[in-house]
Protein backbone atom coordinates (compact mmCIF):
# COMPACT_ATOMS: atom_id res chain seq x y z
CA UNK A 1 0.00 0.00 0.00
CA UNK A 2 1.34 3.42 -0.90
CA UNK A 3 -0.89 5.21 1.54
CA UNK A 4 -1.85 4.30 5.04
CA UNK A 5 -5.53 3.62 5.41
CA UNK A 6 -8.18 3.74 8.00
CA UNK A 7 -8.81 1.22 10.66
CA UNK A 8 -11.94 -0.80 10.90
CA UNK A 9 -13.31 -2.24 14.10
CA UNK A 10 -15.90 -4.61 15.48
CA UNK A 11 -17.32 -6.23 18.54
CA UNK A 12 -17.48 -9.98 18.76
CA UNK A 13 -20.14 -12.46 19.75
CA UNK A 14 -18.69 -15.97 19.94
CA UNK A 15 -20.61 -18.70 18.16
CA UNK A 16 -18.93 -21.98 19.03
CA UNK A 17 -19.16 -25.04 16.81
CA UNK A 18 -18.67 -28.48 18.39
CA UNK A 19 -15.79 -30.60 17.11
CA UNK A 20 -14.17 -33.87 18.10
CA UNK A 21 -13.16 -34.59 21.71
CA UNK A 22 -15.59 -32.03 23.07
CA UNK A 23 -13.50 -29.08 21.90
CA UNK A 24 -14.90 -26.02 20.17
CA UNK A 25 -13.74 -24.32 17.00
CA UNK A 26 -12.78 -20.69 17.49
CA UNK A 27 -14.03 -18.19 14.96
CA UNK A 28 -11.52 -17.24 12.28
CA UNK A 29 -11.08 -13.85 10.65
CA UNK A 30 -8.82 -13.37 7.62
CA UNK A 31 -7.83 -10.02 6.11
CA UNK A 32 -6.49 -10.19 2.55
CA UNK A 33 -4.27 -7.40 1.25
CA UNK A 34 -1.92 -6.48 -1.58
CA UNK A 35 0.88 -4.98 0.53
CA UNK A 36 2.38 -5.07 3.99
CA UNK A 37 0.85 -2.01 5.72
CA UNK A 38 -2.56 -2.39 4.05
CA UNK A 39 -3.64 -4.02 7.31
CA UNK A 40 -3.52 -0.63 9.00
CA UNK A 41 -6.90 -0.01 7.37
CA UNK A 42 -8.40 -2.51 9.81
CA UNK A 43 -5.84 -2.47 12.62
CA UNK A 44 -8.23 -1.97 15.55
CA UNK A 45 -10.58 -4.72 14.37
CA UNK A 46 -7.74 -7.20 14.08
CA UNK A 47 -6.45 -6.29 17.53
CA UNK A 48 -9.86 -6.52 19.14
CA UNK A 49 -10.87 -9.87 17.68
CA UNK A 50 -7.49 -11.38 18.53
CA UNK A 51 -7.83 -10.11 22.09
CA UNK A 52 -11.26 -11.73 22.33
CA UNK A 53 -10.02 -15.13 21.20
CA UNK A 54 -10.68 -15.13 17.46
CA UNK A 55 -8.00 -16.67 15.24
CA UNK A 56 -6.91 -13.66 13.19
CA UNK A 57 -4.69 -13.87 10.10
CA UNK A 58 -3.56 -11.48 7.41
CA UNK A 59 -2.59 -12.62 3.92
CA UNK A 60 -0.31 -10.29 1.95
CA UNK A 61 -0.10 -10.95 -1.77
CA UNK A 62 3.01 -9.04 -2.88
CA UNK A 63 6.65 -8.92 -1.85
CA UNK A 64 6.56 -5.14 -1.32
CA UNK A 65 9.73 -4.68 -3.37
CA UNK A 66 8.53 -1.44 -4.99
CA UNK A 67 7.47 0.33 -1.80
CA UNK A 68 10.15 2.80 -0.69
CA UNK A 69 8.06 5.79 0.34
CA UNK A 70 10.06 6.70 3.46
CA UNK A 71 13.50 5.19 3.04
CA UNK A 72 16.69 5.55 1.02
CA UNK A 73 16.89 1.77 0.59
CA UNK A 74 16.60 1.04 -3.15
CA UNK A 75 13.60 -0.75 -4.52
CA UNK A 76 14.07 -4.46 -5.01
CA UNK A 77 15.18 -7.37 -2.79
CA UNK A 78 16.55 -5.16 0.00
CA UNK A 79 13.32 -3.27 0.58
CA UNK A 80 11.35 -6.52 0.24
CA UNK A 81 13.31 -8.03 3.15
CA UNK A 82 12.64 -4.98 5.31
CA UNK A 83 8.94 -5.11 4.56
CA UNK A 84 8.75 -8.74 5.63
CA UNK A 85 10.13 -7.74 9.01
CA UNK A 86 7.75 -4.79 9.19
CA UNK A 87 4.80 -7.09 8.51
CA UNK A 88 5.93 -9.41 11.30
CA UNK A 89 6.30 -6.44 13.66
CA UNK A 90 2.81 -5.25 12.75
CA UNK A 91 1.24 -8.65 13.37
CA UNK A 92 2.93 -8.88 16.75
CA UNK A 93 1.70 -5.40 17.70
CA UNK A 94 -1.85 -6.40 16.81
CA UNK A 95 -1.61 -9.73 18.62
CA UNK A 96 -2.51 -11.78 15.55
CA UNK A 97 -0.87 -14.74 13.81
CA UNK A 98 2.34 -14.09 11.82
CA UNK A 99 1.63 -12.75 8.32
CA UNK A 100 1.10 -15.12 5.43
CA UNK A 101 3.26 -13.74 2.62
CA UNK A 102 2.52 -14.95 -0.91
CA UNK A 103 5.47 -13.14 -2.54
CA UNK A 104 3.94 -12.02 -5.84
CA UNK A 105 5.64 -9.07 -7.62
CA UNK A 106 4.76 -5.71 -6.11
CA UNK A 107 3.05 -3.29 -8.48
CA UNK A 108 2.50 -5.95 -11.13
CA UNK A 109 -0.54 -7.99 -10.13
CA UNK A 110 -2.46 -6.79 -13.18
CA UNK A 111 0.41 -6.90 -15.68
CA UNK A 112 -1.02 -9.55 -17.98
CA UNK A 113 1.37 -8.85 -20.86
CA UNK A 114 4.44 -9.42 -18.68
CA UNK A 115 3.08 -12.65 -17.20
CA UNK A 116 -0.21 -14.08 -18.53
CA UNK A 117 -0.21 -16.74 -15.78
CA UNK A 118 0.18 -14.40 -12.81
CA UNK A 119 -3.48 -13.66 -12.13
CA UNK A 120 -4.44 -17.33 -12.35
CA UNK A 121 -1.59 -18.31 -10.02
CA UNK A 122 -2.56 -15.58 -7.57
CA UNK A 123 -6.18 -16.75 -7.56
CA UNK A 124 -5.19 -20.38 -7.02
CA UNK A 125 -2.69 -19.54 -4.29
CA UNK A 126 -5.14 -17.37 -2.40
CA UNK A 127 -7.86 -20.00 -2.68
CA UNK A 128 -5.48 -22.62 -1.26
CA UNK A 129 -4.75 -20.43 1.78
CA UNK A 130 -8.42 -19.72 2.38
CA UNK A 131 -9.30 -23.40 2.06
CA UNK A 132 -6.60 -24.16 4.65
CA UNK A 133 -7.68 -21.42 7.07
CA UNK A 134 -11.46 -21.75 6.47
CA UNK A 135 -12.35 -18.28 7.76
CA UNK A 136 -15.79 -17.35 9.00
CA UNK A 137 -15.27 -13.76 7.84
CA UNK A 138 -13.09 -12.09 5.21
CA UNK A 139 -12.03 -8.44 5.00
CA UNK A 140 -10.38 -6.91 1.94
CA UNK A 141 -10.33 -3.78 -0.18
CA UNK A 142 -13.46 -2.62 -1.96
CA UNK A 143 -13.53 -2.28 -5.75
CA UNK A 144 -12.03 1.21 -5.35
CA UNK A 145 -8.94 -0.26 -3.70
CA UNK A 146 -9.05 2.27 -0.87
CA UNK A 147 -6.39 4.53 -2.34
CA UNK A 148 -7.10 3.49 -5.93
CA UNK A 149 -3.88 1.45 -6.19
CA UNK A 150 -4.14 -1.13 -9.02
CA UNK A 151 -2.78 -3.95 -6.83
CA UNK A 152 -5.50 -3.20 -4.26
CA UNK A 153 -8.17 -3.36 -6.93
CA UNK A 154 -6.84 -6.69 -8.21
CA UNK A 155 -6.96 -8.21 -4.72
CA UNK A 156 -10.53 -6.99 -4.24
CA UNK A 157 -11.50 -8.55 -7.55
CA UNK A 158 -9.85 -11.89 -6.83
CA UNK A 159 -11.47 -12.19 -3.39
CA UNK A 160 -14.86 -11.24 -4.83
CA UNK A 161 -14.41 -13.80 -7.61
CA UNK A 162 -13.70 -16.58 -5.10
CA UNK A 163 -16.73 -15.63 -3.01
CA UNK A 164 -19.07 -15.50 -5.99
CA UNK A 165 -17.74 -18.85 -7.24
CA UNK A 166 -18.34 -20.54 -3.88
CA UNK A 167 -14.72 -21.69 -3.73
CA UNK A 168 -13.99 -24.27 -0.97
CA UNK A 169 -13.27 -22.67 2.38
CA UNK A 170 -14.31 -19.19 1.25
CA UNK A 171 -17.10 -17.65 3.37
CA UNK A 172 -19.99 -15.56 2.15
CA UNK A 173 -19.45 -12.94 4.86
CA UNK A 174 -17.05 -10.51 3.22
CA UNK A 175 -16.54 -6.87 4.15
CA UNK A 176 -14.89 -4.10 2.17
CA UNK A 177 -12.56 -1.54 3.74
CA UNK A 178 -12.35 1.94 2.27
CA UNK A 179 -10.77 5.30 3.07
CA UNK A 180 -12.92 8.35 3.81
CA UNK A 181 -12.01 11.60 2.08
CA UNK A 182 -10.64 12.93 5.37
CA UNK A 183 -8.27 9.98 5.48
CA UNK A 184 -6.86 10.67 2.05
CA UNK A 185 -6.23 14.28 3.04
CA UNK A 186 -4.52 13.21 6.28
CA UNK A 187 -2.22 10.82 4.45
CA UNK A 188 -1.25 13.48 1.94
CA UNK A 189 -2.45 17.01 2.76
CA UNK A 190 -1.74 18.18 -0.79
CA UNK A 191 -3.94 15.50 -2.34
CA UNK A 192 -7.71 15.34 -2.55
CA UNK A 193 -9.78 12.26 -3.28
CA UNK A 194 -9.77 11.28 -6.97
CA UNK A 195 -13.23 11.42 -8.61
CA UNK A 196 -15.55 8.55 -7.68
CA UNK A 197 -13.02 6.92 -5.35
CA UNK A 198 -15.04 7.31 -2.13
CA UNK A 199 -18.05 4.94 -1.86
CA UNK A 200 -21.46 6.30 -0.89
CA UNK A 201 -22.05 6.54 2.85
CA UNK A 202 -25.29 4.56 2.49
CA UNK A 203 -23.27 1.44 1.58
CA UNK A 204 -21.54 1.33 4.98
CA UNK A 205 -24.16 -0.70 6.83
CA UNK A 206 -21.63 -2.32 9.19
CA UNK A 207 -20.65 0.17 11.89
CA UNK A 208 -18.43 -1.23 14.60
CA UNK A 209 -16.95 0.29 17.77
CA UNK A 210 -13.38 -0.01 18.98
CA UNK A 211 -11.64 0.64 22.29
CA UNK A 212 -8.73 2.90 23.12
CA UNK A 213 -6.58 -0.21 23.64
CA UNK A 214 -7.44 -1.50 20.17
CA UNK A 215 -6.66 1.89 18.67
CA UNK A 216 -3.30 2.01 20.45
CA UNK A 217 -2.43 -1.46 19.13
CA UNK A 218 -3.27 -0.22 15.64
CA UNK A 219 -1.04 2.83 16.13
CA UNK A 220 1.88 0.60 17.15
CA UNK A 221 1.20 -1.60 14.14
CA UNK A 222 1.27 1.42 11.83
CA UNK A 223 4.54 2.61 13.37
CA UNK A 224 6.16 -0.71 12.40
CA UNK A 225 6.08 0.28 8.72
CA UNK A 226 9.04 2.62 8.86
CA UNK A 227 9.86 2.26 5.16
CA UNK A 228 6.38 3.59 4.37
CA UNK A 229 5.68 6.29 6.98
CA UNK A 230 7.67 8.74 9.03
CA UNK A 231 6.95 9.11 12.74
CA UNK A 232 5.34 12.46 11.98
CA UNK A 233 3.06 10.89 9.39
CA UNK A 234 2.01 8.15 11.81
CA UNK A 235 1.02 10.75 14.40
CA UNK A 236 -0.80 12.89 11.83
CA UNK A 237 -2.77 9.98 10.43
CA UNK A 238 -3.68 8.47 13.80
CA UNK A 239 -4.87 11.87 15.06
CA UNK A 240 -7.06 12.25 11.99
CA UNK A 241 -8.39 8.72 12.46
CA UNK A 242 -9.34 9.43 16.05
CA UNK A 243 -11.03 12.73 15.16
CA UNK A 244 -12.95 11.38 12.18
CA UNK A 245 -13.94 7.92 13.38
CA UNK A 246 -14.98 8.90 16.91
CA UNK A 247 -14.75 5.36 18.22
CA UNK A 248 -16.41 3.42 15.42
CA UNK A 249 -15.65 2.65 11.81
CA UNK A 250 -18.03 1.80 8.96
CA UNK A 251 -17.55 -1.20 6.67
CA UNK A 252 -19.37 -2.13 3.50
CA UNK A 253 -20.59 -5.74 3.07
CA UNK A 254 -19.87 -7.23 -0.33
CA UNK A 255 -23.64 -7.78 -0.50
CA UNK A 256 -25.34 -5.01 1.53
CA UNK A 257 -27.73 -6.19 4.22
CA UNK A 258 -29.39 -4.85 7.35
CA UNK A 259 -27.44 -2.50 9.62
CA UNK A 260 -25.41 -4.49 12.16
CA UNK A 261 -22.59 -4.15 14.67
CA UNK A 262 -21.22 -7.72 14.57
CA UNK A 263 -19.28 -9.27 11.69
CA UNK A 264 -20.35 -12.79 12.71
CA UNK A 265 -24.12 -12.13 12.75
Model-derived regions: residue spans:
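Metal-dependent de-N-acetylase/amidase catalytic core
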Residues: 2, 6, 16, 20-29, ...
Amino acid sequence: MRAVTYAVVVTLTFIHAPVLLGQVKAQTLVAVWAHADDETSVGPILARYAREGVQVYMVIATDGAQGAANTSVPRGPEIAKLRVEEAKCSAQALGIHPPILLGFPDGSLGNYNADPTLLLRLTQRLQEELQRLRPDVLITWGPDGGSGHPDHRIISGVVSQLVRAGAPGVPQRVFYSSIPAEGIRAMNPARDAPPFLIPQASLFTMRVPFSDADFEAARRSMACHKTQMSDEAVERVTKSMRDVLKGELPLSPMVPNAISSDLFR
